[in-house]
């Protein structure tokens, strides 16, 4: 673990000054205190005091507005409680500095491990240094839907590549040949994996990549903006796959605003399987994450890490499920040909 001497060196102060800050001594100038506290956060410094097993784990989510994240957090909490583990939920609002602050707070509380859901690790342009320090310090952490090959951290989640492939295969089976992708930000790993799955399915069907992809922020407005962009293309799509159900609901809204009928004019497929998809108009076809399986395996993996940190803890990826509802149909040209 980082020592007080490391903190002092980072902050450019004496060990005695760093010690006074760590012990809450008020006899330190405010600007000096701020430098030392910043160094503590950056180094994930925790005072070297003996702790008993706390039974606490941290669960960090990027936001609460998208229902899939509270659903995953709740499923984790439900499975952790019978094992004697109490969850502390932290909403990072997709901000690296906030995630780092929460990590420091959780370590200070003596958590036995942490589960990061769709964390900053999925942002390929993001700040990853705190994960590297956590691994170096032997912290017990598990990524959920945050796959990485760069750190020795077990990852549990849905197979994002399979999700993109499954959605594309289904739309091809309906007769669609112009299949757009309403994507999240390009520099996020889940976006790239879904895009790769889509490309694989197109190639397997003998269809060339048509680059009908529009990148936008995750969320309702992002989905609407991405669809608007795709519809302005010279040869717009007859179907779209969305990075999330929330983006897909934004697509439904934008389609209705433009007077398009879903699915007669445009088929829409979401991703996640949130409860709201059963109540959208029309009901949304979606690629569903196995949330309960993911939560069970994440808690099990973390508990094994806590008990046996030196053992091998492999990654676990689950194949998603296609839920066909009312937002998808054959394209108009196929329907006309079939009725002729």
Q: Whereabouts are the PLM-identified features?
A:
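N-terminal helix-turn-helix DNA-binding module of bacterial transcription factors
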Residues: 1-54, 335-340
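Short beta-strand-centered segments that line the small-molecule binding cleft or hinge
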Residues: 100-111, 115-162
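Short acidic capping loops at alpha-helix termini that bridge into adjacent secondary structure
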Residues: 177-178, 209-212, 262-267
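Flexible loop/turn connectors
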Residues: 4, 228, 232-340
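N-terminal helix-turn-helix/winged-helix DNA-binding helices
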Residues: 1, 40-74, 83, 93-94, ...
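Hinge/beta->alpha junction and helix N-cap segments in small-molecule ligand-binding domains
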Residues: 31, 61-71, 89-98, 120-124, ...
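Short, well-structured alpha-helical segments in soluble
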Residues: 98-111, 223-235
